[in-house]
Amino acid sequence: MKETPCPNCGKPLTGDMVRSSNVPCQFRCGHCRERLYEYKVSAPIMLVSLAAIVLLIYLLMLLRNAAGSVLPAVQHVPMAVFALVCAYPVFIVSERMIAKYVIQNGNIIYRGKRKGS
């Protein structure tokens, strides 16, 4: 597996650093605490994520209707609860895959002054 060094301090970046951020294209180095930016893979990842969200909503509606014919009580469960229970494992797996992909294939830059300059 390819290790990507921090452009500021030179220490290796990890997927945990990307996952701890709210936005996958901006995160902090765990060693020097400087904000890093990633430009190469963020836009395609976000487009795929939006498409996956739309697909999941459609599939959840189909699943709820199919389960509603077998168990009528499912029709009275709010769609948000149904979506959280079904989509949370998918979210966790995709978050880890995105972090791994950003670390391996991303173009990570630092906009501030380099250490020692």
Swiss-Prot record:
Keywords: Cell membrane, Membrane, Transmembrane, Transmembrane helix. It comes from the Bacteria. The chain crosses the membrane at residues 43-63, 73-93. It is found in: Cell membrane. GO terms for cellular component: plasma membrane. Disruption phenotype: Cells lacking this gene show no difference in growth under copper deprivation or copper excess conditions. It is a multi-pass membrane protein. Induction: Significantly induced under copper-limiting conditions. This is Uncharacterized protein YcnL. It comes from Bacillus subtilis (strain 168).
